[in-house]
Every structure is written in structure tokens, then in C-alpha cells.
Amino acid sequence: MALKTYKEILADIDTFLFDVDGVFTDNRVLLYAGLDPVRTFHSRDAYAVQHAVKEGVRIVVITGGRSAGVAEAFGRLGVTEFHHSVPDKSAKLDELIRVTEAHNSFI
């Protein structure tokens, strides 16, 4: 029995779940008086998320933060499942896994 190629393995995955800080960012946060903390994203990550959504992949973002800018950015990329202000991301992940039979990849 031959091992599956990475493309064959990826074909079975229909959902990706991500955190924000340290996954889409490099952990730097810019602080300006009177503004929400500013995080920087790489344009290649944005392209990959947008492309995945267009291909029908379910993208879920779970974050402990509450940034209107981050939520808006993911919304522009087509992400419809954005969970912010989550104090226990592990519990939220378990909840999401229970309510779906998706083949998940955890990053």
C-alpha cells in the first residue's frame, strides 16, 4: 500500500482552524495612543486564506483578542467564522469539533 502524497492528504481536509497572534502575525504589536493595538499580517497569508475560501475550504479563526481591525480584515478575506474574546481557545476548539464532522487541520 503506497503512502498518500501531501496533495492527496490535503484533498481530505475541508476545515482549517487558526489562532491569530503568532500564526498570522509575528507577535509584534504596535501601540498607539487612542487606537486599538495594531498587528501586521503577511500578504501571502491573506492571499492563501482568500484562495482557500474561494475553493470552498472552511476557515475558522479563534482568538483571545478583540480587535475590530483584525475582525474586519478576516471578513474582507471571506472568513465568516471569526470567534474573538475567547478566554479558553481549547474549549472553543472542542466545541467546534463536536458540532461538525469536518476533517480538520489544527495550526
Language model features with spans:
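Short, flexible loop segments at the rims of nucleotide/cofactor-binding pockets, characterized by
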Residues: 1, 36-39, 83-85
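Non-catalytic pre-domain segments flanking phosphatase-related domains
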Residues: 1-20
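C-terminal cap/substrate-recognition subdomain and adjoining C-terminal extension
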Residues: 15, 69-107
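A metal-dependent, Asp-based hydrolase signature
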Residues: 15, 20, 28-29, 74
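A short acidic/small-residue loop/turn micro-motif
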Residues: 31-34, 45
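Short, acidic loop-to-helix structural element flanking the phosphoryl-transfer center
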Residues: 38-55, 87-99
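Substrate-recognition element of Asp-dependent hydrolases with the DxDx(T/V) motif
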Residues: 49-73, 84
